């Protein structure tokens, strides 16, 4: 996705709906209509607001950001790009040009939820999650919490776990403790 692509164009793109359902779901929660009509996908990421939806989704999807300076192009993983509140790994002479997101397949599970005072307000807390479906359950869990920390944060306990229905409550309890 090009960095200057408006939120509304991402939300209305058939390709996003088909191959990036996590983004398709979360983009509808971004701000209010005026912001979605004028704001850009890359702008949300470069701004690095810890309560914003797109940084969390980029981390959950293991996105790569393409940064361009006069002399070179650099690729940075989303998890390494966000350093803190509105602070990124972008150098002063660079601009964010492209966001590379791996397509989600029918074997990929995802979830997105945020809690805010009203629709369009900043998230008080939210979660973006991805996983791979296997016959035994879910693997490669990436559960990213946002809105309550300095930057989107991956739950290390969830990332190191596989999930079958019988141990879902146990994992949920461990993740809650990890994030406390």
PLM regions with names:
Residues 1-180:
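C-terminal structural segment of proteins
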């Amino acid at each position: 996705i090009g960095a200057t692509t408006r939120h509304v164009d991402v939300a209305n793109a058939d390709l996003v709906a088909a191959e990036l359902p996590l983004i398709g779901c979360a983009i509808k929660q971004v701000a209010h209509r005026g912001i979605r009509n004028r704001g850009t996908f890359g702008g949300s990421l470069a701004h690095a607001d810890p309560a914003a939806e797109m940084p969390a989704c980029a981390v959950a999807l293991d996105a790569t950001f393409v940064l361009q300076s006069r002399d070179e192009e650099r690729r940075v993983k989303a998890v390494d790009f966000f350093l803190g509140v509105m602070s990124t790994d972008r150098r002063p002479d660079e601009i964010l040009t492209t966001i590379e997101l791996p397509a989600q397949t029918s074997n990929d599970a995802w979830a997105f939820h945020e809690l805010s005072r009203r629709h369009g307000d900043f998230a008080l807390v939210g979660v973006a999650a991805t996983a791979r479906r296997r016959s035994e359950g879910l693997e490669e869990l990436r559960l990213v919490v946002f809105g309550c920390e300095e930057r989107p944060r991956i739950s290390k306990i969830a990332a190191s776990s596989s999930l079958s229905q019988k141990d879902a409550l146990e994992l949920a309890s461990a993740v809650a403790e990890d994030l406390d």
